A protein has these predicted regions:
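Nucleotide-sugar donor-binding/catalytic module of glycosyltransferases
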Residues: 1-224, 305
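C-terminal subregions of glycosyltransferases and related glycan-biosynthesis enzymes
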Residues: 189, 212-306
């Protein structure tokens, strides 16, 4: 890939990541798309993470790998600090996690979509992933996403990990403008915000990376019966419903960023928590909200009605 291609910012947050960091760093170096710069915010690592990063910076140059001190307020705040930096001014950015391994064409495929869009509008690339365990053994893949991504889907679920995301400048500007949004899951918020703005969305069904699974994300990220049952349990007995309305409340804070159609839908969503079950039922069918399977649609409808 020629250096005349647009320069891409890779945004990486690190914290005590020495165990897998070299594998991820090497996967950046192997990318078929070469015109990138890696911005790393280290959140006060106590292990050899900084030494490893300094080693790669020495080999590849301080203009290729740029290190910052993180705010030491947790993972979400670390990434928020990265995307908010005025000195990161590339027109395209990809998020990365320290434990993963990118496939060699990840940036190239992301940029094929992003550069083809109207750059005055936000654009978001998302993708499937191959799941690996702590030893790098393949243990599965991300759930199938057969339905078209849209705001009506984003209101009910996130469909991809933020570690697969690629954004253009218009999308980055929206995320920067909403950096104080009171939401729990920044990845989900990116999908919501870009879609609410009328931005271009693409979910690539071809895996772009090896996503390392840990005990904390093993069930939620995998597909299959266990994952479906886990999601249904969260829907009925967990905080899922609270999260949806938290996101809706956050959306109401920034109406000037969304399309008229999106703002109308945000207002109409209130009918889904009306006292009358009949009102909620009518609202469900009139709004056209959906998840990625009929099974999950039915579960969502039942949750709304009880």
């Amino acid at each position: 890939m020629s250096s005349t291609e647009p320069r891409v910012a890779i945004l990486l947050g690190t914290y005590n990541g020495e165990r897998y960091l070299r594998l991820q760093m090497d996967s950046f170096i192997r990318q078929s798309y070469k015109n990138w710069v890696l911005y790393i915010s280290d959140d006060g690592s106590k292990d050899q993470t900084r030494a490893i990063l300094n080693e790669y910076q020495k080999i590849h140059g301080a203009d290729k790998i740029i290190l910052f001190e993180g705010p030491c307020k947790g993972c979400a705040a670390n990434y928020a600090s990265l995307i908010s930096r005025a000195d990161i001014d590339e027109s395209y950015a990809l998020y990365a996690d320290q434990d993963d391994v990118w496939l060699d064409d990840k940036i190239e495929r992301t940029m094929e979509f992003l550069t083809a869009q109207d750059q005055s509008q936000a654009a978001l690339y998302m993708a499937a992933s191959i799941h690996i365990d702590h030893n790098g053994n393949i243990i599965g893949a991300s759930a199938l996403r057969p339905r078209t991504p849209s705001f009506k889907n984003a209101l009910l679920q996130n469909i991809a990990g933020g570690n697969t995301f690629g954004l253009n400048k218009a999308a980055l500007d929206i995320i920067r403008a909403t950096k104080d949004a009171a939401v729990l899951y920044p990845d989900w918020w990116i999908y919501i915000a870009v879609s609410a703005s009328g931005g271009a969305l693409y979910y690539d069904p071809k895996a772009c990376m090896l996503y390392r699974q840990h005990e904390t994300n093993m069930i939620g990220a995998n597909r299959g019966l266990a994952a479906k049952l886990w999601r249904v349990k969260e829907l009925f007995f967990g905080s899922y419903n609270v999260l949806i309305w938290q996101n809706v409340t956050a959306l109401k804070t920034y109406p000037f960023l969304w399309t008229n159609e999106s703002n109308k839908l945000i207002t109409q969503c209130e009918a889904l928590r009306a006292p009358s079950r009949l009102t909620r039922l009518k609202a469900w069918f009139s709004l056209g909200l959906y998840r990625q399977s009929v099974f999950e649609d039915i579960a969502m409808l039942i949750r709304i009605l009880i």
